[in-house]
């Protein structure tokens, strides 16, 4: 039996053959990631002979960046998947009209924008780690709320607003947090961004494959599953990030000792 991919467009059902476009974007993203990773810029060529930061591409730094990419892949995928298939879910599960579903989607992106604006002043009084934990807690509460009260219209409105508010600033917060842990070079930043883009491709595909007219409830299952996986990945990111900070401090201490020994050898300089 062929599985249909439902996309809100004049109440038509678009077949799963459109999933091929997602795979095309996937392979293009992988190609771009590999190409940008190995590409050497003129600045890097100039610095090739200089002493590089020994912690820049250490195993610990790579693990931390990989976890950051995973967190953003899950968070960005959940963010886009929720916004893309919210109209479908509201129409199939709670019998929303098309206009009501569009208002609901607008509410989601409105609170998403509000959350980004609120995050700006919060960033001046809270640490990146505290902000990320707070955002995840808000998003998890909203997703559980949507799961438990999935048959109530008012719950969908409230849960959608809270979900948009919570998930809005996870992306910039994770980027800022990662910069605290490692030296965020161009290659590392590219790997994280491409990881987020891959999540934005895979998660909506999963939403489309499992959210059907006959059974739209998997929508809230996926919302909860992805955000809990994101929370788990965040735990390991913070744990490995702490190790990266210790490694960086040790290397800086060794570098200071080396400089002090140089000064003792050449006291006149």
Spans of model-derived segments:
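C-terminal transmembrane helical hairpin of 12-TM major facilitator-type secondary transporters
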Residues: 126-174
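Intracellular juxtamembrane helix-capping segments at the cytosolic ends
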Residues: 1-2, 168-183
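Helix-to-loop junctions at the C-terminal end of transmembrane segments
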Residues: 115-128, 211-212
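A late C-terminal transmembrane helix in Major Facilitator Superfamily
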Residues: 182-216, 223
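Small-residue (Gly/Pro/Ala) motifs that create kinks and tight helix-helix packing interfaces
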Residues: 2-12, 87, 119, 202-211
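Extracytoplasmic gate region of multi-pass secondary transporters
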Residues: 61-114
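Multi-pass alpha-helical transporter architecture, strongest
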Residues: 32-40, 222-259, 266-269
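Helix-loop-helix hairpin linking two adjacent transmembrane segments in secondary transporters
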Residues: 1-44
């Amino acid at each position: 039996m062929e599985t249909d991919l439902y996309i809100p467009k004049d109440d038509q059902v678009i077949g799963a053959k459109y999933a091929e476009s997602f795979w095309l974007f996937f392979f293009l993203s992988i190609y771009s990631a590999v190409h940008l990773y190995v590409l050497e810029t003129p600045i890097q060529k100039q610095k090739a002979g200089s002493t590089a930061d020994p912690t820049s591409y250490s195993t610990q730094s790579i693990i931390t960046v990989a976890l950051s990419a995973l967190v953003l892949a899950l968070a960005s995928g959940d963010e886009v998947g929720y916004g893309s298939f919210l109209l479908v879910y509201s129409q199939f599960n709670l019998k929303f009209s098309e206009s009501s579903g569009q208002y609901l989607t607008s509410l989601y992106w409105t609170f998403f924008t509000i959350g980004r604006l609120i995050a700006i002043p919060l960033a001046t009084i809270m640490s990146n780690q505290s902000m990320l934990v707070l955002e995840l807690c808000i998003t998890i509460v909203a997703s559980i709320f949507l799961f438990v009260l999935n048959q109530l219209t008012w719950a969908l409105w409230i849960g959608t607003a809270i979900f948009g508010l919570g998930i809005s600033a996870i992306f910039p917060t994770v980027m800022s947090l990662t910069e605290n842990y490692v030296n965020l070079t161009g290659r590392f930043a590219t790997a994280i961004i491409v990881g987020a883009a891959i999540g934005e491709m895979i998660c909506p595909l999963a939403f489309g494959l499992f959210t059907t007219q006959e059974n739209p409830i998997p929508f809230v299952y996926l919302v909860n599953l992805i955000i809990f996986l994101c929370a788990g990945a965040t735990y390991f990111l913070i744990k490995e990030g702490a190790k990266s900070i210790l490694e960086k401090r040790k290397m800086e201490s060794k570098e200071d000792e080396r400089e002090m020994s140089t000064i003792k050898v050449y006291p006149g300089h």
